[in-house]
């Protein structure tokens, strides 16, 4: 009698070929086993002490990669030179990169892997990079570094808003809290700061509930991390990050990879951002979108601003959360101190 065969979603082409050879499943017609997926997710979401120790090693080297960038960035060099200095730290520790380095003066373009630009005075470089240990465990951090010794006053105003959102999210981490609530909190803090500067108007939380915050934060707040930097991404966010519950389809909110209640043993990133995306500004203004919340006249004066993100890695504990690895400079004065 034929028995059902359980298999996971295929992620690589060679696995699709094997599935076809073994079971006759044509690529694109796969029907992965949800019970199998949930079994793997429920095993890998909870990190053992041995796994935490390995991730900690990755995060320590990842921190050193970011410290190297903070000492390297300056006007007159290319983004590629910063990326090379960052990669050197990982390779010197006999580690791999956990994902291709993002080192860009165009921080408003998410997941931008081009490194061809020359860094100029007045720029900021957004670095998103991590190390992967010999056992395959990942680190993942982001930094935003001024090209000059200090942030300009214009940069500092926005940077401090991002840091406030980051610190508010970290302070909220604890078992039992839905991560979507942490996301909304960080977005609310960003809207409060931007309202003080005249970019948005109205109640900050209403701005978030309406979805207008996605002009400035069209992405999520963080993701699970482990053997994959976006852990088990190929198994499906609805299972990994939402425990089988439906995700939002709203622009911005739909990019939140993690929304479920946090539990001890989870390892995740915290990475709110504040982005000024010219193409999105043009689109929404042409659609008269969220005019009750967004001050487009003010916003358009920041079309050339770029974007800001800082990111750290945390373990959810029995009573709260613990930073993994060593602390890197995040507050503006900390970054500027290492830039001197």
Where are these regions (language model features)?
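Active-site neighborhoods and metal-handling regions in enzymes and metal-associated proteins
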Residues: 1-340
């Amino acid at each position: 009698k034929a028995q059902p065969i359980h298999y996971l979603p295929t992620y690589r082409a060679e696995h699709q070929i094997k599935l076809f050879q073994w079971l006759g499943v044509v690529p694109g017609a796969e029907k992965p086993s949800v019970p199998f997926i949930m079994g793997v997710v429920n095993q890998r979401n909870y990190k053992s002490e041995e796994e935490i120790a390995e991730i900690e090693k990755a995060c320590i080297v990842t921190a050193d990669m970011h410290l190297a960038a903070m000492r390297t960035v300056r006007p007159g060099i290319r983004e590629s030179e910063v990326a090379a200095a960052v990669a050197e730290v990982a390779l010197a520790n006999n580690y791999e990169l956990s994902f291709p380095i993002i080192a860009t003066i165009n921080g408003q373009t998410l997941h931008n892997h081009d490194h061809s630009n020359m860094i100029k005075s007045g720029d900021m470089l957004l670095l998103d990079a991590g190390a992967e240990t010999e056992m395959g465990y990942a680190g993942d951090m982001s930094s935003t570094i001024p090209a000059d010794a200090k942030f300009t006053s214009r940069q500092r105003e926005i940077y401090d808003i991002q840091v406030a959102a980051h610190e508010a999210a970290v302070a909220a981490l604890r078992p039992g809290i839905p991560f979507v609530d942490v996301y909304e909190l960080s977005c609310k803090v960003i809207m409060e700061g931007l309202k003080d500067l005249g970019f948005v108007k109205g109640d900050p939380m209403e701005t978030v509930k309406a979805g207008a915050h996605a002009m400035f934060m069209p992405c999520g707040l963080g993701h699970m991390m482990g053997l994959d930097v976006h852990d088990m991404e190929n198994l499906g966010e609805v299972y990994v990050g939402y425990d089988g519950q439906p995700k939002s389809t709203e622009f911005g909110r739909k990019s939140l990879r993690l929304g479920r209640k946090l539990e001890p043993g989870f390892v995740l990133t915290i990475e709110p951002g504040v982005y000024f995306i010219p193409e999105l500004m043009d689109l929404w203004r042409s659609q008269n979108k969220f005019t009750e919340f967004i001050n487009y006249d003010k916003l358009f004066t920041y079309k050339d601003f770029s974007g800001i993100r800082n990111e750290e890695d945390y373990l959810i504990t029995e009573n709260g959360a613990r930073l993994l690895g060593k602390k890197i400079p995040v507050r503006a004065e900390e970054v500027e101190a290492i830039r001197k």
